[in-house]
Amino acid sequence: MDGIWITELAPGEGRRLAVKDLFDTAGIRTTYGSAVFSDHVPAASAEAVARLEAAGWVNAGKANLHEFAYGVTSQNLHYGTVPNPAHPDRTAGGSSGGSAAALALGLVEGALGTDTGGSIRIPAACCDVVGFKPTFGLVPIDGVFPLAPSFDHAGPMARDVLGCLTLMRGLVPDFAAELDSFGSRRVAVTWTSDAVLAAAAALGEIHEVAFPTAEDVVPAFMREVADVHRELYDESGDLYGENISEKIERCLAVTDSEYAEAVAARDRHREGAEAAIDGFDLLLTPTLATAPPPADVVELDVRAELTRFTFPFNALGWPALALPFGQESVQIVGRPGDDRLVLAAGLALEAAL
């Protein structure tokens, strides 16, 4: 299991935490999954790491990831491909694959991940664990290497929803110690599957809606990636892995007009999304549009498919929880600020199982 790349478990009374190697950790090598930063040792920890350590979590080590968090398979040419302990012939997902794998193996009780297009929820779905992307900006990303800043989220991963809730209490001051009783809700469903319909029925009154996808927003994401990497790639591009260099080149090629069109598309996406769930409490979708691909898949061949149901909520900044339900992973989505409601729905869904 070398590809998970987590250090020996640290001693201590606290719960063990795997920290995605995109988060700075004081005095501990932090590579961002790249050879460019192979000797990088930060002086200070990311704010999210510091908050969890202050809450009693013990950093058990750094978890491997797709290089610079730009990929959905955690195939890392420098530090090894992350294996999938739950389904060894399948990808662990990405980019927070090491965090999900460490949980699936039972190495830790909680993990930190980041999510720019699905990078918490996709590996959670692939490895049969739980991942939560909070409302944009709720969990600080200070000290986290950026991918596309207006899409970037940090959040918790755990083996159950209660684990994610416990982590959120450490990550966000004054996050509710207890959630309100869930009760029956009006639940919108889209891109439906049997698991989604069954999950929605367990939560309340079901209504199928047409929800917009966000393919037209992707060039805005790509321009932000280009802005982050432009200077670094010019200086150290020879150290980038081949499977990320190709994507960086594509990002650098996005024109001003393509970017402007994508920004306008993002505004339309937000308007369409808000209209689609008007009058509903929650939205349920599958987490993945397809089964987890084979472990040796070419990442670019599956990237669009694996992010189809996750990326729209990065473009929106809405909270989204991925959790196992039967043989699938379902995604519970709420409006901005409804993080507690989303987690309460997740707890109710787990209880229904």
Say what each PLM segment does.
Residues 14-32, 220-267, 274, 324-331:
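Short helix-loop capping/hinge segments that flank enzyme active sites or metal/cofactor-binding pockets
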Residues 165, 171, 260-353:
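Glycine-rich, small-residue loops and helix-cap segments
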Residues 35-43, 80-95:
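Short pre-catalytic strand/loop immediately N-terminal to key active-site residues, enriched for Gly-Thr
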Residues 1-41, 45-46, 66-71, 292:
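Short, well-ordered alpha-helical
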Residues 193-210, 230-235, 259-280:
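Acyltransferase
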